[in-house]
């Protein structure tokens, strides 16, 4: 599977400007790419004022993603602020080339920023089937909770989209590698750049690790599109040879 990671600065609470920047990046991606991954809250930055910028699932950004996915024959994923029945969600949407959508609502809301006070938490993770791959998409703070991401579904690829600040970037790098190793899964992390309106600095470090924790794409610190191709056959062969997942402890989340 050929995957493109888009790492960019985000304009605070300005969906139109962010869509324009992202679309320019997408238009420069060569054909034959299977999946494009955007950061967390890619239209707004990590704002705790959702009432200013929230959209619906029939809103402009969703329609824009569907139009691009169809035109480019590529899947696109990332999270944005969605409002439903008066509740706000930090929602990852996975738009297929057909325009069909699957979604995941962030389970672990970032209490340090007060996200839990304004957003509604998701209840379960989602595994998406796409081109013969099983993909588990998660959002930012979810990365710190390995029990939630435990690979009981035999997924092939973990995706984390984030607004992860410079002050804790070492944790981002370390935990992405750990999630790859413990779940024997390719793991992608896509983060943003720039400074937000809370004066938090972001230095990117978007990256890809393989199922043994080895770097496929090293942490990146510049604006751009970073592309790699993942090999499912090698993943399967390694899992057969090193079948660590069969020895994991069995338990359920309450």
Name every feature range the model reports, one short phrase each:
Residues 15-16, 23-100, 165-178, 185:
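Cys-nucleophile CN-hydrolase/nitrilase-fold catalytic domain and related Cys-dependent amidase chemistry
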Residues 7-13:
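Short polar catalytic/cofactor-binding loops
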Residues 60-74, 144-225:
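CN hydrolase (nitrilase-like) catalytic-core segments centered on the catalytic cysteine
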């Amino acid at each position: 599977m050929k995957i493109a990671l888009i790492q960019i600065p985000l304009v605070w609470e300005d969906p139109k400007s962010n869509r324009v920047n992202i679309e320019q990046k997408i238009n420069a991606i060569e054909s034959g790419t299977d999946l494009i991954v955007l950061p967390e809250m890619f239209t707004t930055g990590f704002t705790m004022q959702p009432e200013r910028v929230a959209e619906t699932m029939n809103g402009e950004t969703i329609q824009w993603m569907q139009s691009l996915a169809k035109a480019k024959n590529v899947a696109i994923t990332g999270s944005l602020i969605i409002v439903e029945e008066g509740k706000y969600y930090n929602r990852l949407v996975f738009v297929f080339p057909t325009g069909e959508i699957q979604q995941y609502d962030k389970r672990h809301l970032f209490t340090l920023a007060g996200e839990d006070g304004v957003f509604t938490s998701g209840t379960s993770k989602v595994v998406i089937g796409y081109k013969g791959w099983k993909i588990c998409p998660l959002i930012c703070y979810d990365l710190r909770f390995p029990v939630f991401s435990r690979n009981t579904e035999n997924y092939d690829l973990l995706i984390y989209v984030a607004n992860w600040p410079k002050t804790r970037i070492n944790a981002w790098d370390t935990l992405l590698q750990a999630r790859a190793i413990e779940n024997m899964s390719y793991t992608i992390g896509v983060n943003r750049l720039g400074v937000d309106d809370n004066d938090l600095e972001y230095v990117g470090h978007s990256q890809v690790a393989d199922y043994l924790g080895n770097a496929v794409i090293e942490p990146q610190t510049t604006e751009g599109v970073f592309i790699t191709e993942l090999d499912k056959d090698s993943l399967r062969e390694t899992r057969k040879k090193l079948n660590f997942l069969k020895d994991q402890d069995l338990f359920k989340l309450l």
